[in-house]
């Protein structure tokens, strides 16, 4: 049985768990919430949900989860919204990425909460558009070697993959479309 951990310190944790349970139904997966250290090393994959990147970054450090993520960086990971920032090279006085994906990001690239929106994205790995939900979303400004851009919006990349790491500017867990969660499970074979 494969275990997927969902960092459960902020964000749409329950929605990610529900989506993962739906796409893994009938398969050999177990989904667990991670609030404290000592669990990540038993996981075969990890989801870092959205939320407020400063808060998530601080809580990851406070709980020691940042070190556990780095120690287990070989496992598949999906970061959504603020989770994208955590996977990236992002650095400022308030939040710090873990540098697991070679990309530079911009926080709140699409405005504040009131400017949240949905957009039908053309995604490289899907046959039809994905209705992406952007809420105070970050954007990928620049990618390094080994990054495969899966989707763009305006001048920014908003979905990217590097090996078995998947970073999304938007919130697939808030949609009824489960394709990104299914795609994440495919990363377990790569």
Stretch-by-stretch model annotation:
Residues 1-62, 68, 178-182, 186-190:
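N-terminal beta1-alpha1 cap of cysteine-dependent amidohydrolase-like domains
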Residues 11, 139-190:
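C-terminal and late-domain segments of enzyme folds
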Residues 47-49, 134, 167-169:
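Structural motif
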Residues 94-156:
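Pocket-forming structural segment of enzyme catalytic cores
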């Amino acid at each position: 049985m494969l275990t997927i951990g969902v960092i459960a310190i902020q964000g749409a944790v329950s929605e990610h768990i529900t989506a993962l349970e739906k796409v893994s139904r009938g398969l050999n997966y177990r989904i667990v919430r991670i609030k404290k250290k000592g669990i990540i090393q038993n996981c075969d994959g990890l989801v870092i949900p959205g939320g407020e990147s400063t808060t998530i970054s601080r809580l990851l450090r406070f709980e020691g989860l940042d070190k556990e993520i780095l120690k287990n960086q070989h496992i598949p990971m999906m970061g959504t919204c603020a989770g994208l920032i955590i996977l990236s090279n992002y650095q400022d006085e308030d939040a710090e990425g873990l540098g697991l994906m070679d990309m530079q990001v911009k926080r709140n690239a699409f405005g504040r909460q009131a400017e949240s929106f949905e957009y039908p994205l053309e995604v490289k790995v899907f046959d039809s558009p994905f209705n992406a939900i952007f809420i105070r979303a970050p954007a990928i400004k620049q990618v390094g070697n080994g990054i495969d851009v899966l989707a763009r919006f305006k001048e920014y990349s908003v979905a990217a993959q590097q090996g078995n790491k998947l970073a999304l500017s938007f919130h697939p867990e808030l949609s009824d479309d489960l394709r990104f969660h299914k795609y994440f499970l495919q990363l377990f074979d790569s």
